[in-house]
């Protein structure tokens, strides 16, 4: 075969292989391929409405390891744990959403007027599981309709070797039959790291960064929700404004850490820190492509 003909054949084979690879990735729903399939990371516009439950392979149930299967949510309220929620009076509005996302041990009792009382999904860091156990009767006995989504890496979450946190989750499902507990799969955790690197240009580990529970919550919400309202999350420029009020880092820990002081300290720390402000800049960019609204404080994406 002549050189020009061989070159054309090589190009055609490459195109066909690439097309087949992308189609297989999308069909299989592999998290590590999603960046190729879904307009870099997340599709533009609202999430397509698909009748019936969907399978989400990035989340694995405890103890059987089955993927998350559930109906998509038409409207979602993502409730920040920030002190911005104090005095908001948005509880009824939050509870009116079809699905309500909460994070870690953020309580509702005593704060219903501001943060609502419903909890559809609670995204929990593996380090926060012991904090929920301090009030296990409330979180796991009374709130039986809540789905718990736990994220974490390393030996504590190891299913095969029985990591400490995983053993705790396993025990909870035995104590409370019917309790819905899921974990982010290893592939999904790697995918979340890759999104951070693609969005910021920085490798998470090499830059000394820990992703926040808010990061994992937003990614989960983007998969499950058609429309998202985020309550109590400030913009990436908020803490640089001279007129911003001082509020507690968590609405349920009054008189403790200041929100902006915490954000700035983590952003400037060289190692082992959350990059809260960087993450908020990323969320702002996502809101340009997806129906995400930020409320209390209300701010527009730039």
From Swiss-Prot:
Disulfide bridges in this chain: 76-225
Pathway connected to this protein: Protein modification; protein glycosylation; Glycolipid biosynthesis
Stretches of the chain found on the membrane's Cytoplasmic side: 1-6
Topological region Lumenal: 28-302
Membrane topology field: Single-pass type II membrane protein
Example of a GO biological process term: oligosaccharide metabolic process
Entry keywords, A to Z: Disulfide bond, Glycoprotein, Glycosyltransferase, Golgi apparatus, Lipid metabolism, Membrane, Sialic acid, Signal-anchor, Transferase, Transmembrane, Transmembrane helix
One GO term describing the cellular component: Golgi membrane
The protein's enzyme class: transferase
Record-annotated membrane-spanning stretches: 7-27
Keyword Protein biosynthesis: no
Pfam family, one: Glyco_transf_29
InterPro entries: Glyco_trans_29 (IPR001675), GT29-like_sf (IPR038578)
The keyword Cytoplasm appears for this protein: no
Glycosylation sites per record: 135
Family: Belongs to the glycosyltransferase 29 family.
Function (record text): Transfers the sialyl group (N-acetyl-alpha-neuraminyl or NeuAc) from CMP-NeuAc to the GalNAc residue on the NeuAc-alpha-2,3-Gal-beta-1,3-GalNAc sequence of glycoproteins and glycolipids forming an alpha-2,6-linkage. Produces branched type disialyl structures by transfer of a sialyl group onto a GalNAc residue inside the backbone core chains. Prefers O-glycans to glycoproteins or glycolipids.
Protein name: Alpha-N-acetyl-neuraminyl-2,3-beta-galactosyl-1,3-N-acetyl-galactosaminide alpha-2,6-sialyltransferase
Origin species: Homo sapiens
Gene this chain is encoded by: ST6GALNAC4
């Amino acid at each position: 075969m002549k050189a020009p003909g061989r070159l054309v054949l090589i190009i055609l084979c490459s195109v066909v292989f690439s097309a087949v690879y992308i189609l297989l990735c999308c069909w299989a729903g592999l998290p590590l391929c999603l960046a190729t399939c879904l307009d870099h990371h997340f599709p533009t516009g609202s999430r397509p409405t698909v009748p019936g439950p969907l399978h989400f392979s990035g989340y694995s149930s405890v103890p059987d390891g089955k993927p998350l299967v559930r109906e998509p949510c038409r409207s979602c309220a993502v409730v920040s744990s920030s002190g911005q929620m104090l005095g908001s009076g948005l509880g009824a509005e939050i509870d009116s959403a079809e699905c309500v996302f909460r994070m870690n041990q953020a309580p509702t009792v005593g704060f219903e007027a501001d943060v609502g009382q419903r909890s559809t999904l609670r995204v929990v860091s593996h380090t926060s599981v012991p904090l929920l156990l301090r009030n296990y009767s409330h979180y796991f006995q009374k709130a039986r309709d809540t789905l718990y989504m736990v994220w974490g890496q390393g030996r504590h979450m190891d299913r095969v070797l029985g990591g400490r946190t995983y053993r705790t989750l396993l025990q909870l499902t035995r104590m409370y039959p019917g309790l819905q507990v899921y974990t982010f799969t290893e592939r999904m955790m790697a995918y979340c790291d890759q999104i951070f690197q693609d969005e910021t240009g920085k490798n998470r580990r090499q830059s000394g960064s820990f992703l926040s529970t808010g990061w994992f919550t937003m990614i989960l919400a983007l998969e499950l929700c058609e429309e998202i309202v985020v309550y109590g999350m400030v913009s990436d420029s908020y803490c640089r404004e001279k007129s911003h009020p001082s509020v507690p880092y968590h609405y349920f820990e009054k008189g403790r850490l200041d929100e902006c002081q915490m954000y700035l300290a983590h952003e400037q720390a060289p190692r082992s820190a959350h990059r809260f402000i960087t993450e908020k800049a990323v969320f702002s960019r996502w809101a340009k492509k997806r129906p995400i609204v930020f409320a209390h404080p209300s701010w527009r994406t730039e």
